[in-house]
Amino acid sequence: MTLPRPTSPHIRGPLRTPAIMRLVLGACVPGLFTLTWLYGAGTLLNLAWAGLVALACEAAMLALRKRPPGMFLKDGSALVTALLLAVALPPCAPWLLTLVATGFALIFGKHLYGGLGQNPFNPAMLGYVVALVSFPLEMTRWPSPGSAPGLADSLHAFLGLAVQPDAWAHATALDVLKTDRSLTVDELFAADPAFGHLGGAGGEWVNLAFLLGGLFLLWRRLFTWHAPLGMLAGLFAMSLLFWNGSGSDSHGSPLFHLFSGATMLGAFFIVTDPVSGATSNRGRLLFGLGVGVLTYLIRAWGGYPDGVAFAVLLMNLAAPTIDYYTRPRTYGHRKAERGFRRGD
């Protein structure tokens, strides 16, 4: 008699680091495609150069730390940092800007603290802030979505072989809203090509693309909903609280802030970093909420049009304190403590 031999149930373990990084890279493809479609091939040049610099810095730092380069280079974390920087930097950025941002992110943002899993700050945002402070003019050169340069022009700008025309230095919607106080918001949306239907022209489609990729990662359970929802809720609440209609002194509607700048990139690909963020679910919610509130404060009254990077770094500083006050209670801990004090 033949007895049936059913397979025993198996518990599927967590994804390994290379698999997680591949999913993140894949989720960024819609945003990368949209950026390339709207702003030209400069984003792809940024990605290729940032990827090479990231791998070179990773290999050099691993050699200095006497770590096996093969295993760590294959985990994909350096490429994820390079990709996040490539989509955050202007498509017409010169090669030196991308080199400085990527090198600083890998060397000082990651390996200075011990490598993957030890960094207190998000490496990509640290590199972005360094580029923003070191290259303030170059970081404002975003081309207009309707006049994106071709591959040859993008390559010349990347190598610094040609002077960039004025059409490549178009102000973003956040720039215009922050500096132009002579027109109402409705007049700006109607007159300035930087504005689209929901947010910035082009920027709204980029945000929708990153929202799509972020929802895919959420569906694959690479992170929980707490940090993204906290950031979007904080930004929405602050913009709703200080929104005074469409007057000339308005800072924009809640919908405008949700679909402008790096909102969705930050909500689903930056604040969800498991290393530099909070660890408990309640802590992640507070962490994201703080990023959203600080992002609005910087956009409305700070010195920079978009404040996602600065907000993330400031909340990275607060993450240990958030973890301290939001530690999950150990089951039965307080009951056992009271029983011990009574002498039971």
Swiss-Prot record:
Protein location: Cell inner membrane
Family matches, as InterPro entries: NqrB/RnfD, RnfD_bac
An individual GO BP term: transmembrane transport
Cofactor(s) this protein requires: FMN
Keyword Flavoprotein assigned: yes
Lipid bilayer topology: Multi-pass membrane protein
Predominant location category: membrane
Modification FMN phosphoryl threonine, positions: T172
Keyword tags: Cell inner membrane, Cell membrane, Electron transport, Flavoprotein, FMN, Membrane, Phosphoprotein, Translocase, Transmembrane, Transmembrane helix, Transport
TM spans (from-to): 23-43, 44-64, 80-100, 120-140, 198-218, 222-242, 252-272, 285-305, 306-326
PANTHER family for this protein: ELECTRON TRANSPORT COMPLEX PROTEIN RNFD, ION-TRANSLOCATING OXIDOREDUCTASE COMPLEX SUBUNIT D
UniProt family annotation: Belongs to the NqrB/RnfD family.
Subunit structure: The complex is composed of six subunits: RnfA, RnfB, RnfC, RnfD, RnfE and RnfG.
Designated name of the protein: Ion-translocating oxidoreductase complex subunit D
Organism: Pseudomonas paraeruginosa (strain DSM 24068 / PA7) (Pseudomonas aeruginosa (strain PA7))
Gene it is expressed from: rnfD
